[in-house]
Amino acid sequence: MSNNPRITSKEFQGYAGAAQNAIVALSQAVANSSLEPELQQLVKLRASQINGCAFCTQLHLNESRHMGIAAPKLDLLAVWREAGVFSEREKAALAWTELLTRLSEHHVSDEDYAAVSEYFTPNELAWLSAAVAVINTWNRIAAPFQYAPPILRHAIQAVHEPAQV
């Protein structure tokens, strides 16, 4: 990724405003759903990691930290299966997120559906699927246009200052 986006989010809004507004509306609908906000953030962050979207990964790390999501969950999200810090419901959501994000690599089996259905009602599963769909949509805009990650100023300073031991 370069330091200069190919087009900025503001330019995207100018070029494809109706599309961006529709994605924002879908994002808001998911945010207002019955899914727990923390679970929604984990889903957004995991899909963004898989898709290699620096902007969305950093954005959702910032939001997750602001919400107070435990640091071990954020630190170990990429290895959630082995981490031992996620609930069974979170693990089911993360597995579903990975399946839907990598849909071109495999189909979703009856076993996959049964596994996630143990932890989510049909209504919740519909919203979980919508959450995965919308973050994948954002990733497919922000990653190829190389939106600059929203790195917080204090984080930048910490990188450039030696750690005090």
Residue ranges, per PLM feature:
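Hydrophobic alpha-helical segments
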Residues: M1-V165
